[in-house]
Amino acid sequence: MNYLCLVVTLVAVAGAISGEKFSDDNTGYQSTPSLRIRTTPGRRRQTPRTIGPPYTRRTLRTTTDYSTTVENGNLTTPAANSTEKGNGLYGLRRQTPRTIGPPYTRRTLRTTTGYWTTVEKGNGTTPAANSTEKGNRPYGRRRQTPRTIGPPYTRRTTTDYWAAVEKGYLTTPAANSTEKESRPNATQRREISWTFGPLYTWRTTKGYGTTLETTNATSTS
């Protein structure tokens, strides 16, 4: 009798152990037919896997924080090897840089470290694929890829959307002008000046309220 009881017990234990160890239902449980172990609410590890058709592929990634959510729409593909290691606010996530759209409206989904960095969808407002916001900037501040647009005498380049784009003659910000830090007002900025042609001097300003003044032969602050 004791032998029979031992056999029955071993069979039951083997059946429980042979069950599926990890569930794919995003409940936070590791489940077997006879055992359910509750992990910390919201914190779970996922097996990275790529799903969906070619143009909407997305990857479920390994998460270490519940604030890393999986984007389910087009062109919002978290990287398979991307993990959020800090205790971030809900919605903070990292994206895989991808360039999309026709030649004149190309834009790039960039690596984001905060949810305030949104993707510009218009002409000439292309975030750089390697551009990351490293400081604590107010909502909406971001860096753009410099692009020169317009006919020859009205060419202009955008570097940040809060720096207004001048639309007149000879008011062209330089393509190498970037905002590198948050400056409190328009008086604290660095200027790069150079002369172009016999009559006109162009300059580049960095900082809040960057305005470009253009006069014959001279350009003043």
Swiss-Prot record:
> What name does this protein carry?
Immunoregulatory peptides
Subcellular localization(s) per the UniProt record? Secreted
Tissue pattern of expression reads: Salivary glands.
Does the keyword Signal belong to this entry? Answer: yes
UniProt keyword annotations, A-Z: Cleavage on pair of basic residues, Secreted, Signal
* Region (Disordered) location: 21-155
Where is the sequence biased in composition, kind Polar residues? 25-34, 70-85, 123-133
Spell out the disulfide connections: none
GO CC aspect terms: extracellular region
Question: Which residues get removed as pro-piece?
Answer: 20-45, 191-221
Q: Which domain of life is it from?
A: Eukaryota
Show the ranges annotated as biased composition (Low complexity). Answer: 48-69
Q: Could you say which residues form the signal peptide?
A: 1-19
Please report the organism this UniProt entry assigns to the protein: Hyalomma asiaticum asiaticum (Tick)
